[in-house]
UniProtKB/Swiss-Prot annotation:
Metallothioneins have a high content of cysteine residues that bind various heavy metals. One of its GO terms (molecular function) is metal ion binding. This is Metallothionein-like protein 1. InterPro entries: Metalthion_15p (IPR000347). Belongs to the metallothionein superfamily. Type 15 family. It comes from the Eukaryota. Keywords: Metal-binding, Metal-thiolate cluster.
Length: 72
């Protein structure tokens, strides 16, 4: 059911690649980074692997500026 899925401006997937009604509308998010002194974590937990730049569901823009994969 990925026929309605398309990438927005800048070849970025629409609203978390959920085939939004307006794929060209981008959502701006403010992130606050708190830096401090902590031991370096040298292992990876399963929950951290799902976090990504496109909302954490592994969606990215593939060939011809189409969402790949698009989990609609």
């Amino acid at each position: 059911m990925s026929s309605g899925c398309s990438c927005g401006s800048g070849c970025k997937c629409g609203d978390n690649c959920s085939c939004s009604m307006y794929p060209d509308m981008e959502t701006n998010t403010t992130v606050t980074m708190i830096e401090g002194v902590a031991p370096l974590k040298m292992y990876s937990e399963g929950s951290e692997k799902s976090f990504g730049a496109e909302g954490g569901n592994g969606c990215k823009c593939g060939s011809n500026c189409k969402c790949d994969p698009c989990n609609c």
